[in-house]
Amino acid sequence: MTVRKYTDQDIGELIRIWNEVVEDGIAFPQEEELNMRSGAEFFASQSYTGVAEEDGKIFGLYILHPNNIGRCGHICNASYAVSKNARGKHIGEQLVLDCLKKGKELGFRVLQFNAVVESNVHARHLYERLGFTQLGTIPGGFRMKDGYYENICPYYHEL
């Protein structure tokens, strides 16, 4: 498995994987799925979009961009998506490790996750194992697909 920069030829697969996570309604704040036009614009607008690929097949992706502007512009934010049929194979770990490296290369000093859903224990365990620090808990900060309000846990990692 390698992680590389996305190309325009990847857009269809990136949209498919992204929309799987949006449709699940338990991890991403977005409610609207991407189409070819909005997806191409979305991935191009990121500071970096990485894809996890093996034997020409894309299994996951991450997006990396500033978390804020101006005096806080040195803090970046990222989101990760792994195809449903590839989960549990440590692809997320490879995406996070590549993202940490890429964030530093791009001049960011901190990677911050704003809204890790508290019940997303696999992601939280991974982040903590990789040295991320939880900043606290925001009660009811994420509206799940079923309407339930779940706590969110912001995390950060110095680059």
Q: Where do the model's predicted regions map?
A:
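Terminal substrate-recognition subdomain of acyl/acetyltransferases
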Residues: 80, 138, 146-159
